[in-house]
């Protein structure tokens, strides 16, 4: 099914959210010839560990998405302050509406509506408003999802997971986080894969399917 999508949009409130939520799926889509665009809304300057320059995450997301096969011209990085998205709701909506009017993606990958991070939830809510005429899937961020009932599995193979892990390892500034762990990423994908008799999988909440 996903090989029929020609244009896919990934919404990442902060750099690396998209890679964690659907990095394997992005590689599968790229391999199938899909035009994948990645939009990050914040480089989380105020959350960087000491010693890293302010533009660190802007550079790291470019390296990470390149690992997934996404060219630099398909990456857009905004610089909204972290944890202020609810106050910037209208600005975010206008950015998303402009994307719809300019590009009209076949599918949008975004955070879950059940994500407890205020920035993630704002992007999810405004994504539903901006892209209500196309397919919308909510990706999994387990440490932020208190309620994540998923209905859509994307089966993945070893090389998809290897590229997802390689992308996440480009975030040198985030390697101190417990979830930035290759074993964790692989085992989560393996667990989802076992549930559908595949080697690996990523899972999504379905908000709208337009076929």
Where are the predicted features?
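Short clusters of hydrophobic/aromatic residues that line enzyme substrate/ligand-binding pockets
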Residues: 85, 154, 204
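Short, flexible loop segments at boundaries between secondary-structure elements
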Residues: 134-155
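Active-site beta-strand->loop->alpha-helix modules in alpha/beta enzyme cores, enriched
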Residues: 1-135, 184, 188-199
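Residues at the C-termini of beta-strands that transition into short coil/loop
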Residues: 40-42, 79-81, 140-142, 157, ...
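A short acidic, often aromatic-flanked loop/helix-cap motif at beta-alpha or helix-coil junctions
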Residues: 82-86, 144-146, 160-161
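Short, basic/aromatic-enriched C-terminal tail that caps enzymatic domains
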Residues: 197-211
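A conserved mid-domain beta-alpha-beta active-site/ligand-binding segment of alpha/beta enzyme cores
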Residues: 154-174, 180-190
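Surface-exposed helix-capping loop/turn segments at secondary-structure junctions
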Residues: 72, 175-176
